[in-house]
Amino acid sequence: MHTRAIYPGTFDPVTNGHADLIERAAKLFKHVVIGIALNPSKKPRFTLDERIELLKTVTAHLDNVEVVGFSGLLVDFAKEQQASVLVRGLRAVSDFEYEFQLANMNRRLSPDLESVFLTPAEENSFISSTLVKEVAHHGGDVSQFVHIKVANALMKKEQG
């Protein structure tokens, strides 16, 4: 088990579904880099630094997990990190087509980067950052979907 893997995403915010996949990846690979994407086309609720801190909190118990922000092409970030595996999550069959296209594009850009797909536990399969933000925006309790520190941070954001 000498493989370095990257699990990329926006993580705005990190959910229990993300945490589930991170824990699964940490068992499979020697080192897992959580790559938090800075995507100019998205308007995240949390800054990159806030997302990094929240993910560090959620993954603090995992010795082989590192959290890093990045911008630019994922395949370039993977090369920088000397990663040979790209971890992606599939919540539903509907995710597969898009992920399949991404995997093929990444393979064309970087033939040595292999995509591995993981599925979350059933109780986390419906959770998305978008849904969590929507519930929080309307004053709902999101503590069953995210780490308590993430729930508190979301509540503070919503209160202004």
UniProtKB/Swiss-Prot annotation:
Reversibly transfers an adenylyl group from ATP to 4'-phosphopantetheine, yielding dephospho-CoA (dPCoA) and pyrophosphate. This is Phosphopantetheine adenylyltransferase. Keywords: ATP-binding, Coenzyme A biosynthesis, Cytoplasm, Magnesium, Nucleotide-binding, Nucleotidyltransferase, Transferase. Its cofactor is Mg(2+). GO terms for biological process: coenzyme A biosynthetic process. ATP binds at residues 10-11, 18, 89-91, 99, 124-130. InterPro entries: Cyt_trans-like, PPAT, Rossmann-like_a/b/a_fold. NCBIfam families: coaD_prev_kdtB, cyt_tran_rel. It is found in: Cytoplasm. Coiled coil: none annotated. Homohexamer. Substrate binds at residues 10, 42, 74, 88. The record marks 18 as: Transition state stabilizer. One of its GO terms (cellular component) is cytoplasm. It comes from Shewanella piezotolerans (strain WP3 / JCM 13877).
